[in-house]
Regions:
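Mid-to-C-terminal alpha-helical segments outside catalytic/metal-binding sites
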Residues: 1, 258-297
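Divalent metal-coordination and catalytic microenvironments
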Residues: 11, 50, 82, 146, ...
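Active-site gating/metal-coordination segments in enzymes
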Residues: 67-70, 75-149, 203, 208-213
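Short acidic/histidine-rich active-site segments
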Residues: 53, 207-208, 232-253
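Catalytic pocket-lining loop regions of alpha/beta-barrel enzymes
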Residues: 147-222, 226, 236
Length: 297
């Protein structure tokens, strides 16, 4: 199949460090040369932009990420917000909902820390299998920041769960669900659940491609085909969400280009029309995260 000329990866982490709570150094990404090599290969395949979902408490390093972007020749968009327990920094427990929202607004409108580089989205904010009160507080704070700035929001769902509960919080604040992406929904094996979410007007991400220890990619391809055939192709974005060094190609992993080289042809064979991939791999994410403007990509 012919992949689109322009591609936008909707959920990645250029620098991330979840190694502490996970007690696993593999969950730290900080190898500059290896990351640049992976990203350069993506650029060769047509990737023009990457949405970096790393936020406060996840090991975000904007200066490092900008150096990777410059070396690889790709645009990287930065995020603000907080992840989920047990990865939340102390401020999530000591500050009020409004104070947390104010931090997000500042990073969106003024800049992240002392870099002068502004975040362009709130993400990835997450929930555990059961939503904890600190996590709910972050969702409320993010909703307030969205109301003030109009910034898009990306969430983390644990194995695809609690999507409806996340939406209920957003709805209570009047969040524009067309600017919201629920991540990792491809980890849910429930196609009806996926459709119920999409029927709310929200977007979902098939962004754990290649993580076959959770779900086989053949199933992902089948679900994607069904959703596209049933008219949801404008509400789905795609990515790899690589967070482990062992996922890199030079470490024997699938590598970032697996989505384009292996999964996209698999999904095409499963029934996703070739022309639909421009939406799945570029246009949808452009609309959600960039407001259709290609000038900022």
């Amino acid at each position: 199949m012919k992949i689109p000329e322009k591609i936008l990866y909707a959920h990645e982490h250029t620098a991330i460090d979840l190694s502490g709570p996970k007690n696993n150094i593999d969950c730290r990404l900080d190898d500059f040369d290896a990351t640049v090599a992976e990203y350069r290969h993506l650029v060769e395949r047509g990737v023009v932009s990457i949405i970096d979902q790393t936020n406060r408490g996840m090991g975000r390093n904007v200066a490092y990420t900008e150096k990777v972007a410059a070396a690889a020749g790709v645009k990287i968009t930065h995020a603000t917000g907080y992840y989920k327990e047990p990865f939340l920094p102390p401020e999530c427990y000591t500050l009020t909902e409004q104070q947390l929202s104010d931090i997000m607004v500042r990073e969106l409108t003024v800049g992240i820390e002392d870099t002068g580089i502004r975040a362009e989205l709130i993400g990835e904010i997450g929930t555990s299998k059961e939503i904890t009160e600190p996590e709910a507080k972050i969702f409320r704070a993010a909703s307030r920041a969205h109301a003030e700035t109009g910034a898009p929001i990306c969430t983390h769902t644990t194995l695809g769960t609690r999507g409806m509960e996340q939406l209920e919080i957003f709805k209570s604040f009047g969040v524009d669900l067309s600017r919201v992406v629920l991540s990792h929904i491809d980890l849910s094996a429930d196609l009806d659940y996926m459709k119920r979410l999409l029927d709310q007007g929200v977007n979902i991400a098939f962004d754990t491609i290649g993580k076959c220890n959770y779900q086989p990619d053949g199933s992902r391809a089948m679900w994607l085909s069904r959703l596209c055939r049933e008219g949801y192709e404008n509400q789905i974005v795609m990515s790899m969400d690589i967070t482990r060094r062992s996922n890199f190609a030079d470490r024997g992993g699938v590598g970032y280009s697996y989505l384009l080289d292996t999964f996209a042809p698999m999904a095409c064979e499963a029934g996703v029309p070739e022309q639909t991939f421009e939406k799945l791999l570029y246009r949808n994410a452009l609309r959600i995260y960039k407001g259709q403007s290609e000038a900022s990509v």
